[in-house]
């Protein structure tokens, strides 16, 4: 019998996109939710209870070992690039974690970010080296332990597995973690265990679960005992309408006990809301709480559980809110909830884009990811996109910030009508259900807008250029002088004034020709014929002379302050030469 005072340990599964987190959980629970999620990536936290009986059944070697924990509750954190507060909350919520790494691809940026989260949260974890069945030449032994299956492989495959495992060991060492393959680890507190597995064939899954149970049992007994008693504490995963029940909450209870009739407090769109639990619906073991299924009604639940709560007045509860059972300490809990919700607020800038999302976790996910890409956010809110949101966004001065990102949240009809109007161009709206795709769309649009703006700026700003008069290419001496020149650097355009390298004015370059065709501009390296008004060859200029475009001071300021990084090296050098000539006479010219 499981000790009723010991709660189910919470396990979170983290890792790089497409490394097989959801597939691994699918294998463990025997269901398949991969295809139902947007972009085949899990966007909201789901929870699955895997009872100890199921784990014993999978791992024959555990049948005789006394186990006093009731099973494992898995949280499947979002599987895309945004390792965010939703994940950090997943990390903090979890007692243990499985970090999924594709054995062939090794560590990716998100893997390292997941490691940092687990380190920050001080969460013990195991590495699941997935997709061993993809190793060339691997012979499948369905549902066997890794060591049993490994023993049946040929030497080349064994060597390949060893090499790939030690590449992971090496990378972990670089990041400050001591690790080895699980069967070579004697002290699981000091060393990370790497368990090679295949979600597709089930190989190694039993070993992984055995290690997780062992870790929980050996190192977390006291912590798990203490958490099962007292008033319940949890996190609201989702606020949902259920037929026959009205508005319900999907909750992860991570501490204490929750019973029918308990008064509970949560954050709502207005402030803190309290209500009494009408009914508790517990998912049947081995089912994912986010998949529609029958629930069993229970009178009370003990942490850790994924539970559905039915109660009056839940309509405005915010997904991601903490949930507390009150015991006459309402003021204290309300203050705690308000503090926690304030901490959720993201870093907002004076100027930036506007974002809307369906849950706090999603909002944070979006904000954190935008922050990592140095995209500023001016306003971040939970809820649908309204006409008012668009009107507010219109006031943003920078056109590349006059943008609204809508993640997984509806656009209300009045706003949709505005967006559909082909004449409405004031605000650019991006909406989607996969965070990284949404951000990629915005970044692509923003970069294109910048490119268009830069092109327009280049066309309006006079560009630096340096030319040299070529021998045997004087076609006319004056009125206007027509000569052949080579462009030594920069970008030469027609209709500009020219000066010598000592700053002396020469005349006005009126037109240019290349192979007897009129052109507007010429890049470095080209040889062209130019007409110069106000100059006479043999008097003001001679063959072999170098000339520079005489740039107005206001154009130099724009070039140096706004466009310098977009100028090629030769253009930058010509600009520097011209500015140095002008500053000999006027030290602060162009500054």
UniProtKB/Swiss-Prot annotation:
Residues 15-22 are annotated as: G1. Residues 198-200 are annotated as: G5. CDD domains: aeIF5B_II, IF2_aeIF5B_IV, IF2_eIF5B. The keyword Nucleotide-binding applies. GTP binds at residues 15-22, 76-80, 130-133. Keywords: GTP-binding, Initiation factor, Nucleotide-binding, Protein biosynthesis. Residues 6-220 form the tr-type G domain. Residues 130-133 are annotated as: G4. GO terms for molecular function: GTP binding; GTPase activity; translation initiation factor activity. The lineage of its organism: Archaea, Methanobacteriati, Methanobacteriota, Stenosarchaea group, Methanomicrobia. Residues 40-44 are annotated as: G2. This is Probable translation initiation factor IF-2. Function in general translation initiation by promoting the binding of the formylmethionine-tRNA to ribosomes. Seems to function along with eIF-2. Pfam families: GTP_EFTU, GTP_EFTU_D4, IF-2. GO terms for cellular component: cytoplasm. InterPro entries: EFTU-type, P-loop_NTPase, Small_GTP-bd, T_Tr_GTP-bd_dom, TF_aIF-2_arc, TIF_IF2, TIF_IF2_dom3, TIF_IF2_dom3_sf. Belongs to the TRAFAC class translation factor GTPase superfamily. Classic translation factor GTPase family. IF-2 subfamily. Residues 76-79 are annotated as: G3.
